[in-house]
Amino acid sequence: MTQANLSETLFKPRFKHTETSTLVRRFNRGSQPPMQSALDGKNVPHWYRMINRLMWIWRGIDPREILDVQARIVMSDAERTDDDLYDTVIGYRGGNWIYEWAKQAMDWQQKACQEQDAMRSGRYWLHASTLYNIAAYPHLKGDELAEQAQALANRAYEEAAQRLPGSLREMEFAVPGGSPVTAFLHMPKGDGPFPTVLMCGGLDAMQTDYYTLYERYFAPRGIAMLTLDMPSVGFSSKWKLTQDSSLLHQHVLKALPNVPWVDHTRVAAFGFRFGANVAVRLAYLEAPRLKAVACLGPVVHALLSDPQRQSTVPEMYLDVLASRLGMHDASDEALRVELNRYSLKVQGLLGRRCPTPMLSGFWKNDPFSPEEESRLITTSSSDGKLIEIPFNPVYRNFDRALQEITDWINHRLC
């Protein structure tokens, strides 16, 4: 089936799909104060979703393109679930968040199909994949339209990988007690086996969101990147997120000696946001298999255990947490009790001495991850490094932090 036909088949005009903001039915919804963070964007008035401009631009989307799509959503007079929230248009039609971003992606997909130059075509496919991922954001369980957009994102990513430098392998790993999981191994030019970074992404992102990290930071240093979707989303959607948050990544890590392109004696883990919960768990549970663990804006204790901090987090992010935990009808109180069990300090890990070198980067006044969170990680390690990242200029400082983190990882993998 051609890519265009797949798009037409998946996205037949229908208006009965459940609108994204209604998928999680928590009882204690209320107004939230304005909030901004480098990794998550900000909760803009009249939007259900957090607008994550930094990460979208970092992934290659033009700021004007973001504004154009937002404008189409704002201008729609179609029926909304909540008249006060622009991105709650019901059904797959003009003004609906998924419709508008997927439409934008299809334009780039068409350009990719028409482009004769393989490299340029690959760039267009990658651009389309990123836009499809934004269409599916924040990837709530049971969001049929988002799942269809995600299928197109994965297909576009595979098309891009065939045309861009280096090579990509789609790999399946068995996990006892359930379905196998699919991972993508990104390899730089040259002969393997390669030192490899196991990427542990945030709960509101997909494994195909991190190509920029590989291309700009890891590949130039000859490092491969292995990505895996977090439990309950994407290729790992059949697995529920549990207190054993590192379960899937742990099984992949244990299987690496059987992967000929990976130097299993030189592996590090890198965790964004809740992905740091996975990475730090691995630092404790699989220390002999890891040379280093790096974290950025980690969510390992404070947000999971502090009700006051949870009350400042945007509704969308609480919905993401509830969705990943399978608590679609939970009160805030029930959600808080469950989240507390995911704290690595409550689990008795963080605070104990860990032999794995650990680095953690933080932004001051980050509502998701206070400085103490990163300090707790680095002081628990026998070889810890703490990095404070200035907020402004946000893009340049983000790039500098990633360069420093990559150099640190590279030093420990050599």
Swiss-Prot record:
Protein keywords: Hydrolase, Serine esterase
Enzyme Commission numbers on file: 3.1.1.1
Alphabetized Gene3D superfamilies for the sequence: alpha/beta hydrolase (3.40.50.1820)
Domain of life: Bacteria
GO MF assignments: carboxylesterase activity
Keyword Hydrolase: yes
Pfam families found in the cross-reference section: FrsA-like
Enzyme class: hydrolase
Catalytic activity from the UniProt record: a carboxylic ester + H2O = an alcohol + a carboxylate + H(+)
Function, in words: Catalyzes the hydrolysis of esters.
Similarity remark: Belongs to the FrsA family.
Protein's name according to its UniProt entry: Esterase FrsA
Recorded name of the encoding gene: frsA
